[in-house]
């Protein structure tokens, strides 16, 4: 029933695509297919097949987002399940990535991935603009310094990641602004630490007789300048923003109604459910709303 609540809320909120991963098959293929029928958005996967090697889902979708063609591919790292066969993800990606790229201004990969497959994907030269990955507890601060920006949004549903893409020339690579903004910020912090509280200090003069420190200063200044140049010269850009889904977020009444109705059905069937991690036997009454899905009441 919890899965039904999630699907029903996304039906109202809007969703371009869902790419299932290993955890989504915990209740079996039949359950996934039931949720797929309930959803008014597509389930996609290029490499989750039935046991005979036939596709269970469309491998990708092309979405029109404000006049920009966005190709979205679904992919998963290998996992073992009696109901499905998982094709090698890099092999599956290689078979269709050019087909999707030819139809897209922007190509996004939704990847339920092991780190080893991310590394293989990064070194394969695929024309992918952005990777949004699951199967990782990390909450990315930027997309990393490899060729393709790769973001992990964590596993608790506590944050909403927003990606604003500026497309000036679909044939040019995207610049992940967060990488260079973080590079500048970290270098500035190191320089300020060397200033020891006096932000107008001339570091070159202070450390003129300390060659190792001068070398550090030059390195940090070079990092700042190279980041500024990258930001200035970017043609297409990705700007990431994170939004904490806490008490300051105003609930949409229609979404809250779906959640509360779903919880009421669960309580009718199984009795009141405690937050995740509650020891057996503890009081399960007065459980508040858990709108971010982490099992902890928000209010």
Where on the chain are the PLM-derived regions?
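Acidic, metal/ion-coordinating pockets
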Residues: 1-299
